[in-house]
Amino acid sequence: MLKIIIPTIMLFPVIWYSNGNMIWINTTSYSLMISLMTLPLLNQTENNSNNFSLMFFSDSLSSPLLMLTVWLLPLMIMASQHHLTKEPLMRKKLYLSMLTFLQMFLIMTFTATELILFYILFEATLIPTLIIITRWGNQTERLNAGLYFLFYTLIGSLPLLVALIYVQNSLGSLNYLVMNMWSQDTSSLWSSNLLWLACIMAFMVKMPLYGLHLWLPKAHVEAPIAGSMVLAAVLLKLGGYGMLRLTMILNPTTKIMAYPFIMLCLWGMIMTSSICLRQTDLKSLIAYSSVSHMALVIVAILMQTPWSFMGATALMIAHGLTSSMLFCLANSNYERIHSRTMLLARGLQAFLPLMATWWLLASLTNLALPPFINLIGELFVIMASFSWSNLTIIMTGLNMLITALYSLYMLTMTQRGKFTYHIYNIKPSYTRENTLMSMHMLPLIMLTFNPKIIMGLTY
């Protein structure tokens, strides 16, 4: 594990010793090297667990998420170049250091064996994200967004700490590898339902569950591009990862407690998809679409069947790459037009034909077009929920329909139609941007050929 963590720590001297004209190329190439070094982790052993040490391990659930995290750092650095050009060198270095801190915390979160260590690192990811949003965001509302983000996450995860300390006292260990072999049943503890709620609530806020999702659109809209990318692609997956880890341990309570949450998610995903149809703000639309996709993941995790687990992990990885790509595209529009309103960005296909191709591909992956892994994930979840209750097919089917509607609405609003007169002198698309989009798209296409490496624990 140290072969990933130590190179990530060594990014700091690379950042601080680079001079102004080399800082981008140095950090991008170095972080790409780290992501290539992580690739062997995807090849899992027979017993499905690489126990590196007492502190860190990886299995087929954490290694795809780990890979997603390290793959995203070079992409975030590439996406941030344009809007940091006017900043002084010191601020550029600070910004890159924050991204590196975030990457380091995330790597350790996904591989921690001990639940308290996981909790500490889970909370530590909050600090760099908050600094990125409140320092480099575009509008003054970013402080409000940062406050929302901070309080929702902190208040959600305090009960988790209390519950973890209680479990530690009553059972003596919080190690994942030991907890799976528990002889004592959790339902014999004081009030297992409250314990379950306390453990799961932190991840529900992070996912976010419909009703606790109000921090997400605010944070996404106000964050700079790298903040939006890492928030959509990795930080939401932390919630899913924590839920997958804990619900397995908290059985059989999950089977009783899951009903209201499954109902809320099935209702919430239709609601948030419908909100997407009414959005004028491009980033806000993508943020709400994240909420509706993550609701499907919560449904899958709470159903506790092998198929739904496979669907949840596949959907998490697919959504990470897709939503990150959509935010990059929205940002490339914003850098040219200086507005997030879709009405002001009409008819861009005539000016940027290659960008229109990327827009089409991103919209199609977002609406789960076959053969992409988005569809594989969604189909697994829908089949699992259908066998749980036949009526869920109405909700999930309606959700797929509305998703297709707002994805195509987003595509036609930004690319087609009569262009507005203030975009005559916009810049062409740069090689950097096209490389960035292709590096989002390539993993999605490649995973289509071998989806089993992201199918998670049960495959």
Swiss-Prot record:
It is an enzyme of class 7 (translocase). InterPro entries: NADH4_N, NADH_Q_OxRdtase_chainM/4, NADH_UbQ_OxRdtase, ND/Mrp_TM. It is found in: Mitochondrion inner membrane. The chain crosses the membrane at residues 20-42, 60-80, 92-112, 113-133, 147-167, 194-214, 224-244, 256-276, 284-303, 308-330, 351-373, 391-411. It catalyses: a ubiquinone + NADH + 5 H(+)(in) = a ubiquinol + NAD(+) + 4 H(+)(out). Its EC number is 7.1.1.2. Coiled coil: none annotated. Its main location: mitochondrion. It holds the Pfam family Oxidored_q5_N. It comes from the Eukaryota. Core subunit of respiratory chain NADH dehydrogenase (Complex I) which is composed of 45 different subunits. PANTHER family: NADH-UBIQUINONE OXIDOREDUCTASE CHAIN 4 (PTHR43507:SF20). This is NADH-ubiquinone oxidoreductase chain 4. It comes from Microcebus simmonsi.
